[in-house]
Amino acid sequence: MTPQISHTKFGDIIRLCNSSGAFVELCNYGARIIRCCVPDVRGKIDNVVVGYSDVGLYDQDEYYRGAIIGRFANRIGGARFNLDGKEYHVTANEGRNCNHGGKNGFNRKSWSFSTNSEGNGVSFVITSLDGDEGFPGKVTLRADYVWSDDNRLTLHLYGETDRPTLLNPTNHAYFNLSGGKGTIENHLLKIKAEQYLETDNEYIPTGRLSSVEKTAMDFRQWKSIGEDMPKPYGYNVCYTGSEALVFDPFSGRTLRVVSSLPGILLYTAGYCPTPFESLCLEPQYWPDCPNHPSFPLCRIDPAHPYSHFITYDFGVRKG
């Protein structure tokens, strides 16, 4: 179907609708997902992405809702790193640390965009100049979203640079599979990972990988998110896996997130105005990876561009 494009003071909104009537809405401000409307087990279509009903509020958003994060998703400890023997200092926007790319990351930028010939996808493009938020190199990032007839949203991320740099983008959508009816504490979650990254009280990795065995972090088998959830802020933890599954018994909706990236961060919105109203599953390179030689490094250069995918598969099943 032909994408529907509406223009607002805040940005351009692109709706991709499939043959069943399910649809996603994307916006060029932050290349973000602002709505994803899919059926429940009874066939009722509802929005499962938690955002703002007034799109103008995204301009004031402090929680990265639905946006592409960059240049570096998650935290860089001390807002500094060494790359190829040179030390770089990036913007510290969370105490002494850099979080989600600094004060004016990709989430706060208007991206150019074009729709594909099939009518089921949109490509967003942004260019980040050398020195942006302290990061080296000029980077051009393209985010390709495609919405399928079987309710799969695929995101391909492609990044190029003119000199060695770091690039670690992700999408920061907040999901509530019940359509916003209640919290996500009764959602069931399964994460295919044996380990998670141990962090300090600023969520900076210590360098140690911890086993999930006999901990609140263990989601290798289906478990309700609220069953062992740490209080008061819930989960904000990166797993060493690339697949997660969510099931909402109330609606029967399911979500499967798969990526080509080495980690996936579980965040239960504990620092949002309404804690635990939603959850984020953010595929990414591990936080603070340039400061830990044993971690996979998100280094790119002119001969080695960035190329990764994330898929969000929505479905239904009976409890």
Residue ranges, per PLM feature:
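An exposed, glycine/acidic-rich loop-and-rim segment of catalytic or binding clefts
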Residues: M1-G319
